[in-house]
Amino acid sequence: MASQVSRRAFLQVAASGAIAGQLDSHFHPATALTQAKSAASDWSLNATIIEACSCTMFCPCYFSMVPSGHGHGSMVDHYCRFNMGYRVNHGNFKGVKLDGVTFWIAGDLGADFSKGAEWAEITFEPSVTKEQRGALTTIIPHVYPVTWKAFTVGQDAPIEWTATNDRAVARLNGGKAAEVVLRRNPGMTSEPVVIKNLRYFGAPRNTGFILMPNEVEAYRVGPKPFEYKGTNGFMITYDISSKDIKT
C-alpha cells in the first residue's frame, strides 16, 4: 500500500466484505473508522494466544517500541516477525457468540513501530461465520492500536491449537502455512515461569505471560515468509470488553 492504514480501519473494511482477498489501497480509512466506532456497542472477549516472534527472550516490544536487533555492527536490523495462534474462550458481540473461534495473525512490527508497523495478515478458520468475523474485526483493533503499512486477509485455513503445562502447539493449514511450537521455560519448580502485572498491548486485563521459548515459529506463505528457532514465545489469556473502551 502506498499509504499507511490503521489496523482499525483495515479490520472494519474486512468486516464489510473485503475478507475474500488482499486489501485494495483505495478505500477510505476515515469512513471505516467512523463505522468501527458506531459498531462498538456491548461486547466482550476472553482469548488465549499461543504467540512467538523473532525477538530474543523476553520480547522487548512490551517495554519499548523498538524490537530486538539482528546482525552485527552497522548491519543490525530491528524487527519483530510474529505469529499469534488465537483461541476465543468466551465472547460475544451484539448477541453473536464467539466461544471456541480460532484465527491467526502474523506479521512484522518493523524497526520502530511508533512510526508504523510493517505488515500483518489475519487468517480465519473456514468454520468462522460472517457474523463472527464481523464481530472479531471490530473488537481486535482495540487490542492492537497499531498503524500498519500493509494489512491483508489470508485464505481461510484449518487451525490446530493445543496446549499443556509443558508444551503448546499451533499450526495453520497443518503447518504448511504457519507453525508455532513452544516449550515451557525451566524454572525453580515444575510450574511455568509467569510475568505478572505487565500490560498486553491494549488489553486491560491478563492472567500473565507464561514464558515458553519457541522450538520453531514460522510463516510459510505470501511474499515475506520467515522461520526462527529458539526465540521468544509465550502464552497469554487476556480479557477486554466494550466497557473498557473510552468513547
Where does each model-flagged region fall?
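Beta-strand-enriched cores of mature, soluble protein domains
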Residues: 41-247
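C-terminal segment of N-terminal export signals and the immediately downstream linker at the start
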Residues: 24-46
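Short N-terminal micro-motifs specific to bacterial/archaeal maturation
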Residues: 1-2, 46
